[in-house]
Amino acid sequence: MAFWQGLINWLGYGHEGEEPVMEKPVLEAETTPVTPAKGKLVGLPTARNAMRLVIARPQSFEQAAGLAENLKNYRPLIVNVEGIPVEEARRIIDFLSGAAYALGGRVRKVTSGIFLFTTSNVDLSGDLEDQIPGGLNWLEAAGRGR
């Protein structure tokens, strides 16, 4: 029986007690510190950076340049020119219309004497002009025509 046991052990199928285990030295891997790459931050709309609408009632043409600054900063602008002289109102509307056009925006009449100026970052839907009697001739609609 010793013969068969020896053969089984020699083939590797038997248990012969514990064999001496040779320990291999453990090698430590070199580690290099990894610095995380900076990701691109994208701002999400919040209440702080929400769009602001400026409402103004200019008294003279000298205020038109200050109002155009709002358009340059991509803020929509509502201007009420009721109650000021016709020529002064016409100059203000013409100046702000040019500023809005230069910025890729639009001009919409809200009521006679009140206009909405927008820039390219504002999308308007609807057709306000169709709802206002007098069409685009706001001076005649206000009773202040030439």
From Swiss-Prot:
It is found in: Cytoplasm. Keywords: Cell cycle, Cell division, Cytoplasm, Septation. It holds the Pfam family SepF. One of its GO terms (cellular component) is cytoplasm. Its main location: cytoplasm. One of its GO terms (biological process) is FtsZ-dependent cytokinesis. InterPro entries: Cell_div_SepF, Cell_div_SepF/SepF-rel, SepF-like_sf. Belongs to the SepF family. Homodimer. Interacts with FtsZ. Cell division protein that is part of the divisome complex and is recruited early to the Z-ring. Probably stimulates Z-ring formation, perhaps through the cross-linking of FtsZ protofilaments. Its function overlaps with FtsA. HAMAP family: SepF (MF_01197). This is Cell division protein SepF. It comes from Moorella thermoacetica (strain ATCC 39073 / JCM 9320).
